[in-house]
Amino acid sequence: MEECKGGGMSPSSSMDSSTHPALSTTSSAATARRDLSTDLRLGLSLSTSSSSSLLQAAAAAAAADDSIPSTPRNSQVHADWPPIKPFLRSALQKASAAGGGGARRRRTLFVKVYMEGVPIGRKLDLLLLDGYDSLLIKLCHMFKTPITYADVMECHQQVPGQKAAHVLTYEDQDGDWMMVGDVPWELFLSSVKKLRIARMDKC
């Protein structure tokens, strides 16, 4: 009986819960759930940490872009091009601000001057002169010859002490050749296109 009891107790005592099919399945399922929950927590923490690091990097890059001042390169190129000297730039700005519309507003009034018998012409800025007398003196000095002109009061007036062999004429806006001095100086400046020093015997 003792052996039987001992033998009867031996199978029940030697039976392990791990070898039982139902208990083994339950233990495996619990272990799998624990592993899955651990993996999910790890994955969530990894994804959260990686996404937060990406967000921090993007915010740092945006802050760096905002801190760098944007330089309008195109506007600087257009503003500084063409490379001209400061005084020339200011002169061009003044000329553009002044605009046209008359001899008084213009800064320069260059006209071509030709002398009969001389193949090479000259250029003269009429706005640097203050009247017909200064124009005549300037042309006499340029061409080394005495020149006369017709003024408003008289047909011809010679320079005192000199015998003029040439007379000054000009081409107006209509293409007609006129005697210099027939109209007031301001009207002459608004209509003159070209000057010609002609011989007296041909006028």
Curated annotation (Swiss-Prot):
Map motif EAR-like (transcriptional repression) onto the chain.
Answer: 40-44
Tell where it localizes: Nucleus
Protein origin, superkingdom: Eukaryota
Keyword Ribosomal protein among UniProt keywords: no
Q: Where is this region: Disordered?
A: 1-31
GO CC annotation: nucleus
Q: Which UniProt keywords apply?
A: Auxin signaling pathway, Nucleus, Repressor, Transcription, Transcription regulation
Signal sequence annotation? none
Induction pattern: By auxin.
Cross-referenced Gene3D superfamilies: Phosphatidylinositol 3-kinase Catalytic Subunit, Chain A, domain 1
Domain PB1, residue spans: 108-202
Q: Where is the composition biased (Low complexity)?
A: 10-31
The similarity comment for this entry is:
Belongs to the Aux/IAA family.
Q: How does it assemble?
A: Homodimers and heterodimers.
- Please give the function described in this protein's UniProt entry: Aux/IAA proteins are short-lived transcriptional factors that function as repressors of early auxin response genes at low auxin concentrations.
Q: What is this protein called?
A: Auxin-responsive protein IAA4
